[in-house]
Amino acid sequence: MHPVHPASQTYLGIPGYAFTWLIFVSALCLFSFILYRRYVLIHSGQFDPRLSEIGKRLFGLITYGLVQRRQPRYLWAGVLHIVIFWGFVVLGLRSIDLISQGLNLPFLRPLMQGGFAAFYNTLKDLFELIVLVACTAAILRRAIGKPERYEGSHQFEAYFVLCLIAFLMITDMFYEGSALLLDKPESSQVGWLPASQLAALVLSGCTPGALRSVHVLGYWLHIFTFFFFLNYLPLSKHFHIITALPNIFFRKLGKGSLKPARWGIEDLEELETLGVQRIEDFTWKHILDFFTCTECGRCSDNCPANAIGRPLSPKMITIKVRDSGYEKVPILNWKRVSDKENETSPMVGGLITHDEIWSCTTCGACEEECPVFIEYIDKIVDMRRHLIETSQNPKTFNQVLMHFEKTGNPFGKPAAKRAEWVKEMEDIPVKILQEGDEVDTLYFVDSYGSYDPRIQSIASSIVKGLHMAEIDFGILGPNEKDSGHQVRRIGEEGLFQLLMEENVEVLKGCKFEQVITTDPHAFNTLKNDYPMPMTTLHYSEFFLALIESGRLRPSNVVDGKDVYTYHDPCYLGRHNGIYDAPRKLLHSLPGLKLVEMERSRDRSFCCGGGDIILWHEIEQEDMRMAEKRLQMARQTGANILVTACPFCLIHFEDAIKTAGLEDEMKVVDLMELLISTL
């Protein structure tokens, strides 16, 4: 090591190495203690198995953690983040090298010589300049642009950390720049050093004594800032710098499904309570989610409930619960909240209001947008489970849930009338399956297709299509219960289990190759919630295959004056990744002109939900979701909105009437449109 390295000098008679060791040991001890206190909170969480499919998790870690695939969904902010992230990674090696030299353990020195040193130093210097520009741009963007999605975030922390990162770049630039002017061997590496040379240009008028002071000060400020930054991270929203990669690795792999009431416990009667009331009722992974939130606001910016003025912000729920957790398990114990105080200050119904919890449509837009894979729906449903269990649910649910329990449908209609709609199809025989019957395709109609007159027309269209394609099919009729999708997502886990068990028993009694469904909600719950392995298809997938195989041939030309746009249902698109099948089916219809809305595919805007909104409306909202979605459809120039979900159809038809758009807009189900061309 060069004899005049800052750590080799003495200060007040004490070797610089001793000061470096003091800073190093003190910082690591403090950092370990802070992490331990954070671990205490995670350890208080419930069991959650997250070690399945290691290969898939590692691939996701690379794709979403290192490559940061989701960041550019917000292009400008995403590019800035990627630049700062990778600059921090590249400069991290430099900081470690400086610290190791200061500890007189220069294990990286052999690597920092020769050809690699020239390459690395050039790369490092380039990144220092780029990161400085990116930090400045990020600060100006926040200060001048003031994006709405940052409202409620800890703004000071964002500015402070950006300044710390920039300061790390500047201290190294001036450390190297002064070394270049002093011509120290350790710094005169072969290679282009733009950042160091820029600093040297700034310092070019300084005396040798001043340069030596800058060199020494640059070193000590750099390592002190590095360790201060390290310890500040777990105390701020930038804890995600440490927790983001683990959170992405332990992410939920399967979309559409919900976690059980408690992992590892199948019998609900074994549980003392259902759902979540306190932070320790969440799973350890969900608590890690709270630590990992970057407060970027992408979740709330894409939340349809938030967009129409409902009192729901996924970001603010995360921030509020995280901050309350920090108060409950603080770094130092003198402000620890007592158990008695926790009992009188409930999280659900207190910190998080009932309207926040019931405003969610479980559309998944927040989870689709989150760059660090925070899970919101499971948390919301867990809190609903607590409200249902303690009878704090909206009173409008009571009668509907009683109907589900007594009759297996939300209307309270007898099971004997579940298949009455098929009687109107006198020319088409519909087989009602009994135990032991066998068909190629089982059509699971579900409750709205069975009882609601408007949705029965969609079910009839599906039956007509099956008949025209000469498919051997049948329905369960009176033996079918509601799929339970809505029941589970409003938090009535016990009732869902009952409906599911009765349906599974009936399904096991029949033989079939595949199941098709009317709506994406039943499709999702049969595919992702039911334990019975079976091939489950939404009708759009099924009938597209029939068209592509030539078993169905659309021939009637659609009116060329009409312009169509397709609305992606949440539980078909985001939750199950089915975007192309409905569009390919539409493109197969002769004469149809299709245009896309700006918010489509995985950024589709929820219609209002096929779950809660069916039986409970939130008073605090500026407009209905379906009306806002209709505005988006009209902006494309379309006059016909196509959907593949009966609940979307119900909401859009109602919104067209309330908005007075009967002469301008029309909504049609994809299946009805297909049948009109056959």
Regions found by a protein language model. Give the residues of each.
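Juxtamembrane/interface segments at transmembrane-helix termini
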Residues: 31-49, 100-105, 137-155, 173-189, ...
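Membrane-interfacial helical/loop segments at transmembrane boundaries in membrane proteins
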Residues: 1-9, 101-119, 178-213
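Hydrophobic alpha-helical membrane-insertion segments
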Residues: 82-94, 160-185
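Ferredoxin-type iron-sulfur electron-transfer modules and their immediate structural context
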Residues: 230-359
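Membrane-interface segments at loop-to-transmembrane junctions
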Residues: 50-51, 55, 73-78, 112-123, ...
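Iron-sulfur-cluster electron-transfer modules
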Residues: 2-137, 144, 281-290, 312-316, ...
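Alpha-helical membrane-embedded segments
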Residues: 23-30, 132, 166-167, 212-249
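Iron-sulfur cluster-binding electron-transfer modules in prokaryotic oxidoreductases
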Residues: 199-210, 258-260, 265-271, 376-678
